[in-house]
Every structure is written in structure tokens, then in C-alpha cells.
Amino acid sequence: MAAISREEVAHLARLSRLAVTEEELGTLAGQLDVILQAVAQVGEVTAADIPPTSHSVPLTNVLRDDVVAPCLSPQEALSGAPDAEEQRFRVPRILDEDVAS
């Protein structure tokens, strides 16, 4: 398996909106390469005799009845909030750019 390049790490950092120094690019490339090699080894395991599962242990009766129980009113839920608007928590905007681009 080919090693992950510094350019690929820089691209992933940009997509993740992470500020990464040149020194960190090299370190991260090495670390990600080790992770990818481990994932490749897992993919090589022959498991034809093992049935596919969604959990490592069997799960039964994991759902509970949907019972209406007392809960907080909107006013009670928002009472400790620093800012609220129209019965909703109001938080500062974190994205200053158009998400579609």
C-alpha cells in the first residue's frame, strides 16, 4: 500500500478546516499511513465462516415502550440559557461562509 502523501494530508486538513503546520504535515502523514496499514490488515482477514453482524454481542429487547413522562416546559428548559429566541436556544454563528461552496 502506498504511503499517504503530505499533499493528501494537507488536502484533508483543508477539508476539515484544520490549521496544520509543515512539520505537522509530515508527522500526520506518518501516523495516517500506520492507521491505513492497520485497516488494510483487517480487510485481509478471511472471515467467510463468520456471519455478518451489526453488533459484537447479540441484542434482544433493546427497545422500550414509548411512554409519555413529565418533562420541562420550554420556559424551564430555556431558563438557564444565556440567550433564547422563539422558544429556542440562540447560539453564535460559527460558519461565516456559504456552506454550498
Swiss-Prot record:
Similarity section: Belongs to the GatC family.
Q: List the residue ranges of the region (Disordered).
A: 75-101
* EC category: ligase
Statement: the UniProt record of this protein carries the keyword Nucleotide-binding:
yes
The molecule here is called Aspartyl/glutamyl-tRNA(Asn/Gln) amidotransferase subunit C
Q: Name one GO molecular function term.
A: asparaginyl-tRNA synthase (glutamine-hydrolyzing) activity
Q: What does this protein do?
A: Allows the formation of correctly charged Asn-tRNA(Asn) or Gln-tRNA(Gln) through the transamidation of misacylated Asp-tRNA(Asn) or Glu-tRNA(Gln) in organisms which lack either or both of asparaginyl-tRNA or glutaminyl-tRNA synthetases. The reaction takes place in the presence of glutamine and ATP through an activated phospho-Asp-tRNA(Asn) or phospho-Glu-tRNA(Gln).
Swiss-Prot/TrEMBL keywords: ATP-binding, Ligase, Nucleotide-binding, Protein biosynthesis
- Give the E.C. number(s): 6.3.5.-
Q: Which reactions fall under this protein's catalytic activity? A: L-glutamyl-tRNA(Gln) + L-glutamine + ATP + H2O = L-glutaminyl-tRNA(Gln) + L-glutamate + ADP + phosphate + H(+); L-aspartyl-tRNA(Asn) + L-glutamine + ATP + H2O = L-asparaginyl-tRNA(Asn) + L-glutamate + ADP + phosphate + 2 H(+)
Complex formation? Heterotrimer of A, B and C subunits.
Query: Basic and acidic residues bias located where?
Result: 85-101
A Pfam family in this protein?
Answer: GatC
Enumerate the SUPFAM superfamilies for this protein: Glu-tRNAGln amidotransferase C subunit
One of the GO biological process terms: regulation of translational fidelity
InterPro entries the UniProt entry points to: Asp/Glu-ADT_sf_sub_c, GatC
